[in-house]
Amino acid sequence: MIHSSVKRWGNSPAVRIPATLMQALNLNIDDEVKIDLVDGKLIIEPVRKEPVFTLAELVNDITPENLHENIDWGEPKDKEVW
């Protein structure tokens, strides 16, 4: 559990969200959030406009039938690392 405090931002109260939580929620500055009061608890949830997939979910449907061939891009150039 992370503790924070209510501060002033202009004329409004504000709570800082630590970077670790922003990363865990895949949130960025200016992303829209939904704020609700449920049973005396302040609930802040990201508003997802597009689905967010994990790498495991994205590769789960890869089969030998739809797997693309490897492409030979040649040798690395300059500072490229392969």
UniProtKB/Swiss-Prot annotation:
Disruption phenotype: Decreased sensitivity to dramatic intracellular increases of ppGpp. Double mazE-mazF disruptions survive high temperature, various DNA-damaging agents and H(2)O(2) exposure better than wild-type cells. They produce more P1 phage than wild-type cells, while introduction of lysogens into a growing non-lysogenic disruption culture is lethal. Double mazE-mazF disruptions show reduced biofilm formation, and survive antibiotic treatment in log phase better than wild-type cells. Induction: Expressed in exponentially growing cells. Induction has been reported to occur after amino acid starvation in a ppGpp-independent fashion and to be Lon protease-dependent, but also to not occur after amino acid starvation and to be regulated by ppGpp. MazE alone and in combination with MazF, represses transcription of the mazE-mazF operon. Fis activates transcription. Part of the relA-mazE-mazF-mazG operon, there is also a second mazE-mazF specific promoter which is negatively autoregulated. GO terms for cellular component: protein-containing complex; toxin-antitoxin complex. It comes from Escherichia coli (strain K12). Residues 4-49 form the SpoVT-AbrB domain. Keywords: DNA-binding, Repressor, Toxin-antitoxin system, Transcription, Transcription regulation. It holds the Pfam family MazE_antitoxin. This is Antitoxin MazE. InterPro entries: Antitox_PemI-like, SpoVT-AbrB_dom, SpoVT-AbrB_sf. The gene is mazE.
